[in-house]
Amino acid sequence: MTYYRVRLPDNSPESQIGCFCLFENARLMADANPGYCVFVDGEKVYPA
């Protein structure tokens, strides 16, 4: 299963504000919180 984590660009676990199974939900959370990105296994996937 893939987990999409919403964090600040430095990918620090302390900055995580959400973890989702669906990319669309993670993207919406990141878009609603300026400065946040979506990560999968430590790699930024959104925004590209």
Placement of each model-derived feature along the sequence:
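Aromatic (phenylalanine/tyrosine) cluster motif
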Residues: Y4, F20-F23, Y46
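Acidic, low-complexity, intrinsically disordered interaction modules
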Residues: N11-S12, I17, C21-M29, N33-G35
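Short, mixed-charge low-complexity intrinsically disordered segments
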Residues: D31-A48
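Small/flexible residues
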Residues: R7-P9, M29, Y46
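Short aromatic-glycine-(Arg/Gly/Cys) micro-motifs in beta-strand/loop hairpins
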Residues: M1-Q16, Y36, V40
